[in-house]
Structure formats: C-alpha cells, structure tokens
Amino acid sequence: MNGLKIPFTGLKKQYNALRTEILDVTDEVLRSGQLMGGNYTAEFESWLAKKNYSKYAVTCHSGSHALEIIAEYYRLQTSVNPPRAVIPAMTYVATANAFIRAGWEVNICDTDVYGQMDIQKLPRDLSVQAYVLVGLYGSAVKDNKFWSTDLIIEDGAQHWLSNNCNRIGNATALSFDPMKNLNAYGNGGAVVTDDLDLLEFAREWTNNGKPKHTNIGTNSRMSEIECAQ
C-alpha cells in the first residue's frame, strides 16, 4: 500500500472545469431577483420534454419527490385500495419509499443479471396496478411487449440519458442529484410525461396546491439557480 487516496467522486474536478460558467450564470440569476419559476426554469423544462421525446416536463425538488408525485397521481386514478406496485429488488430505497408514502402496496420482483426486473419472475397471481422499471448504472430499461397494456412508471434517476432518451413508461421520474447523469450543484428532479392531467397535478403538488387547491401539495420547486446550471 502506498497511501494513494482516490477521490470517491469527481465533483471538485468537474466544478473547476465549469467554475466560470457556473458563477456567471448564478450571478445573473441572483442579480435578476427572480429566484424561482423564472425563464431558466421554463427553458429547462422545455428542453427536458424535447430531450425525452415527451410533451411535458415539470421540475421539482428531487428525484424522490418526482416519484412521489407520480405515485400519488396514479393512486388517485384507481379504485383499488390499496393499489399494488411491483418494483425490482435492485433499486435505491427511494423507489419503494415514494409508493409506500403515497399509499401503495409494494411488491418486490427479482432481477436478471443486469439488475433489471425479470419478467419471468413477476408475480402472476397478483392484481398489479403499476410496474416500476429502474435502469441502474446508466443501463436503459428494456422495452418489452409485456409492458404494452400496463401502467409503466420509470424511475429514471440513473438511466434517463441512455437509449437516446426514449421513454417507455406513462411517466418518468428524473433526478439531478450531484451524483446523477445530469447534475445540479444542489437538489433537483423532474416528472416527464405525455399526460396533461399529470402535468397539472405535478405543478400544483410542487407549489402547495396552488392555484386551485383542489389537491394538496408541498413546497417542492427547483430553483432558478439549479435550472440555470
């Protein structure tokens, strides 16, 4: 052992390479006085929707909140109580947490050698309302005809930039955690979908139910600084 220390992340090196650009745009946002819900947020959401070949994108505080938004929305769309969601055995705990917090019963399915849900091991004797697909380490989730008639939700925190950003789910949760594919220097997430009702639900959820207050929500907005970065 020669005492060599290898950094766990390369965030410092990345920041040093982008420092001038990051500081310039951060200063621009702060000098504008528009710290939330401004042009950078709108531009980033528009870019995300186009990048993912989807109609809509809504930013939020984190990938975990993006999953919660999706889970709560689809729980309200079903008469089954509690609805059941199947998630892969290999995923971060936030995937399960989001659905449990939203009132779902979570069933765990074993994975294949790539860490993705193995359709051969899916529970056939259960009534399932949603399948949650997770692509780990940048590996795209598999587009299988098995999913064609079911509610499919993608936890895209680690894989959304793969497979040319083609989405196969009804909705996808994205994360911009500093350790993710596209990172912010803080927290951030987004919901990507073609569902206009989900878009409106997400916008209300992230802003304490405003403006109609027909649904409850919380403060889960992504700041202008993080969107600009």
PLM segments and residue spans:
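Active-site phosphate-binding strand-loop segment of PLP-dependent enzymes
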Residues: 113-184, 190-192, 196
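Pyridoxal 5′-phosphate
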Residues: 5, 17, 53, 76, ...
